Amino acid sequence: MEANAGSTLAPVNYSDDNVAKPLENQPVNFYSLTLEDLKAYIKSKGKEQFRAQQIFKWVYEQRVTDPEQMTNLSKEFRQDLPSMLSFDLPPVLQHLKSVDGTQKFLFDMKDGMSVEAVVIPSEDRLTLCISSEVGCNMACKFCFTGKQKLKRRLRTEDIVGQFMQVHDRLAEGQRITNIVFMGMGEPLDNPEAVFKTIDVIHSPWGINLSRKKITVSTSGIVPEMWRVADAKVRLAVSLNGPNDEIRSQVMPINKRWDTKALLEACKEHYRVSKDKITFEYVLLKGITDQLEHARQLVKLVKDVPCKINIIPFNEHPGSGYERPDDDTIQAFHTELMNLGAHVLLRRSMGRDIFAACGQLTTVKERPQTMDISNSRLAGLPKYKRELLAAQEAEQNNQH
């Protein structure tokens, strides 16, 4: 799909801060490179280009990064490789496991920054929810990450590195089957690194994951949405409001690209890709959860082949929003189904370790050390006890 400079889908120009820029005569991070990048780099060093496929296979298929173990490389090349390439990965600062099987990883970006990624299990898949930025510029009101201003966009090696570190910590027999760019940050605010990462993830010489198993989620950066169809991956859109008034209230991006522009881009995506769009809709008590909102939502998206994921709000310290009660959630779900919508009520996974949708942040969480024995909290659901304990800890840290 090519961008038309006169359409709403024309691309935005970004300064390329996503490519590794090593000091002169310093090795390049291997995970910053696609196969074609590595071929060109090796050629520039006077080496045979076919060595790139060999190295990719060693690293991504065999998980070997020690040049001395890459036995089909010449001795001379193995000796030269450490001066050409580094295989550094972002260290794992914290690895938490939920009672429901969800796992959360906190990564050190080595510059004082950190990001999180989440592994979500289900019957037939194991999904990695991956981050694309430290913080986020979108400032969605209900999102914990949105409270943090964008600190920096992740580079390709930062994103690929999340996958590699998670993969190497999975239980025997487990493997990542799906990847969703739904972690910290707005993927289409960092398109160069995100779509370069997708090239590595999809490459048969790389991670070798089908493009149909990769989903890019956006809050609605309309001029960049053409890239998702161009990459032949799936599109998810954070809608979260049944009309412009409510969506603008909870998602400031709607003031720049309203629902009309957003849905036109969605229709264009379907025209090119023939893939249904997934609309994500967070239920906020008293704001987006009424039956009239359900009716408005169905009317809003009626011309876009789609499915709707309903996500009951996951509370976090200082959010100012509440999760609707179960009866309200079920009534909203039923109303959508009665109106003929293809709808899924998403189960919130990992709430006890603050790994659910909208709860990711850049600091170590406290669930391992939270004191929830206080009798005042004892009668509450576990996730609510931990939320209140986290809020108290946050307040104590501010004093």
Swiss-Prot record:
Question: Where does the record place the catalytic residues?
Answer: 116, 357
Indicate where this protein is primarily found. Answer: cytoplasm
Give yes or no: UniProt keyword Iron-sulfur.
yes
Q: Which NCBIfam families match?
A: rRNA_mod_RlmN
The record makes one more remark, namely:
Reaction proceeds by a ping-pong mechanism involving intermediate methylation of a conserved cysteine residue.
For this chain, the family text in UniProt reads: Belongs to the radical SAM superfamily. RlmN family.
Spell out the protein name for this chain.
Dual-specificity RNA methyltransferase RlmN
Please tell me the species this chain comes from.
Answer: Bdellovibrio bacteriovorus (strain ATCC 15356 / DSM 50701 / NCIMB 9529 / HD100)
Protein encoded by which gene: rlmN
